[in-house]
Amino acid sequence: MRASSEASLKAAADRWEPVLAEAGESARDLAESIFAVVDALDSSASLRRALTDPARPADAKASLTQGLLGAKAPDAVVDLVAGMSRSRWSADDDLASALEEIGTTSLLAAAESRGELERVEDELFRLGRSLIGARELRIALSNRELPVENRVALVDALLEGKVAPETELLVRRAATSMRERSVPNAIAHVGELAAARRRRLVAAVTAAVPLTQGQLTRLGEILERAYGRSVQINVGIDPEVVGGLRVQVGAEVVDATVLTKLEEARRRLAG
């Protein structure tokens, strides 16, 4: 993807994270709905163009999305796709690729909510390694001329009951969506997403009033410097929160005073 599509994907993924946090294990259902949208986009060049045409008004693209999906998908997924159709995409197939990644992230979030993310990451790594030495299986899974249902049956025969359900679904997608040049490459990419998600920290922020994008960006920078890792910020609103802001990272509660001191210390060091 080019820079504009990457920026649109990141913005959509950031907006989607609070939905995943609230969904818990149900994020798996959201993922499957997103994948259904991806399949529809992949099968219709005219639909891809209609939802990504930069000359078409953003509101018109969002209305088209809402009309097409309507009651066919959860409200959260309709809102996600409508919002993404408003964004700028460098190529008409980038929207589908971005949704594929968000669907994948949703499955990983479902595994994470069950405490199984590390297991899924490990299973993906092991499977990718085993495919390197299994030429016939690798070719069969990557064969675009083989009907999709045959590739799904092959994955099920290989993995059903032996791995986490999210792992099996992710490998199914790798074998059917064929966005990467080969299934091992697709599995490796998903494994990288799983590893990145497992390494990140999540900050649950409760604010007395909604934070501006600038405030969120600054807060994220302060927390990332403090913890030395990427921090995902999920925001909730409570008018009665003490001090106007409450931040919890893991089991640690960080109040507004501590954040102020961290920022002041950073400025002194920078100066």
UniProtKB/Swiss-Prot annotation:
Report the locations given in the UniProt record.
Cell membrane
Superkingdom, taxonomy of origin: Bacteria
List GO terms (cellular component aspect): plasma membrane; proton-transporting ATP synthase complex
Q: Which keywords belong to this entry?
A: ATP synthesis, Cell membrane, CF(1), Hydrogen ion transport, Ion transport, Membrane, Transport
Quote one Gene Ontology molecular function term: proton-transporting ATP synthase activity, rotational mechanism
* Membrane-topology annotation of the record: Peripheral membrane protein
Which coarse location class describes where this protein primarily resides?
A: membrane
What does the subunit comment say? F-type ATPases have 2 components, F(1) - the catalytic core - and F(0) - the membrane proton channel. F(1) has five subunits: alpha(3), beta(3), gamma(1), delta(1), epsilon(1). F(0) has three main subunits: a(1), b(2) and c(10-14). The alpha and beta chains form an alternating ring which encloses part of the gamma chain. F(1) is attached to F(0) by a central stalk formed by the gamma and epsilon chains, while a peripheral stalk is formed by the delta and b chains.
Family the UniProt entry places it in: Belongs to the ATPase delta chain family.
Please give the function described in this protein's UniProt entry: F(1)F(0) ATP synthase produces ATP from ADP in the presence of a proton or sodium gradient. F-type ATPases consist of two structural domains, F(1) containing the extramembraneous catalytic core and F(0) containing the membrane proton channel, linked together by a central stalk and a peripheral stalk. During catalysis, ATP synthesis in the catalytic domain of F(1) is coupled via a rotary mechanism of the central stalk subunits to proton translocation. This protein is part of the stalk that links CF(0) to CF(1). It either transmits conformational changes from CF(0) to CF(1) or is implicated in proton conduction.
What's the protein called, per UniProt? ATP synthase subunit delta
Q: Which organism is it from?
A: Beutenbergia cavernae (strain ATCC BAA-8 / DSM 12333 / CCUG 43141 / JCM 11478 / NBRC 16432 / NCIMB 13614 / HKI 0122)
